[in-house]
Amino acid sequence: MIEIKDKQLTGLRFIDLFAGLGGFRLALESCGAECVYSNEWDKYAQEVYEMNFGEKPEGDITQVNEKTIPDHDILCAGFPCQAFSISGKQKGFEDSRGTLFFDIARIVREKKPKVVFMENVKNFASHDNGNTLEVVKNTMNELDYSFHAKVLNALDYGIPQKRERIYMICFRNDLNIQNFQFPKPFELNTFVKDLLLPDSEVEHLVIDRKDLVMTNQEIEQTTPKTVRLGIVGKGGQGERIYSTRGIAITLSAYGGGIFAKTGGYLVNGKTRKLHPRECARVMGYPDSYKVHPSTSQAYKQFGNSVVINVLQYIAYNIGSSLNFKPY
């Protein structure tokens, strides 16, 4: 994550729904806002959230009475992506998870925050021929909010990972916010090699397989792309080896193969997957962030997480708009 000196959200309160690891919380707190409520149903995510923020999020959002939620200025929600992910079953609103958006809507209707800040998978934009996004947009408009949506890629905002997500920003209409802009992309100058742990800490991750085939030479220059160098086995999604002079593949909560969830990388002549701490760095989490002690849970959690830096840039621009200062 980046250091933000100009705290655009100072004095504002927010709630953290579908909180996961607390990525939204890190981003908004870095801009000066205060978290007054968190909600997350997964017990392992609750554990790591409490380890880092000293509070256990409330559980099942469908059972929460919206009237009991504290007043707030910004509602944050990276609502579940499994229902909309290309690697999932693509049911969306027909799946019970899909209807969790309506729990967001009923809280918005009751509490009327100034801003609603949502995140979802890229596929959300095209899901069900665009109807899913249309339902969200129409619902927010009915509740008297504007609706801004854009797909942004983490690699355009300082993070060496191809991770495209849709970000949805809604301002309450009576605020008459006309000047909101999504952050402008900039050239990447950090690559996977810059985020690696010392070899001595990751020796247990090294894979030595007889069916390892290197198909390409290591590259000399860094590049804002994934660069495949080789494969093991049949070369399926979790069996590919990449250069650390490029960017990381999209971290995933699911998938199989020897390098499942992170991809394989050629590091100082050896092949391995990423360490959970390296996954944290590739998502913008600071090294002060405590990772779940279960390695399998940690990989899953970062595969499901939000990218801190992208949220920080958006949060800053939200604050700029509320403070009537164009970015």
Swiss-Prot record:
Catalytic EC class: transferase
Catalysed reactions, semicolon-separated: a 2'-deoxycytidine in DNA + S-adenosyl-L-methionine = a 5-methyl-2'-deoxycytidine in DNA + S-adenosyl-L-homocysteine + H(+)
Sorted UniProt keywords: DNA-binding, Methyltransferase, Restriction system, S-adenosyl-L-methionine, Transferase
InterPro entries: C5-MTase, C5_DNA_meth_AS, C5_MeTfrase, C5_meth_CS, SAM-dependent_MTases_sf
Entry EC no(s): 2.1.1.37
Mutagenesis / variant outcome for changing C81R: Cells grow as well as wild-type, loss of methyltransferase activity, DNA affinity is about 10-fold lower than wild-type
Active site location: C81
UniProt xrefs under NCBIfam families: dcm
Descriptive protein name: Type II methyltransferase M.HhaI
Organism (species): Haemophilus parahaemolyticus
Taxon lineage: Bacteria, Pseudomonadati, Pseudomonadota, Gammaproteobacteria, Pasteurellales
Gene name, Swiss-Prot/TrEMBL: hhaIM
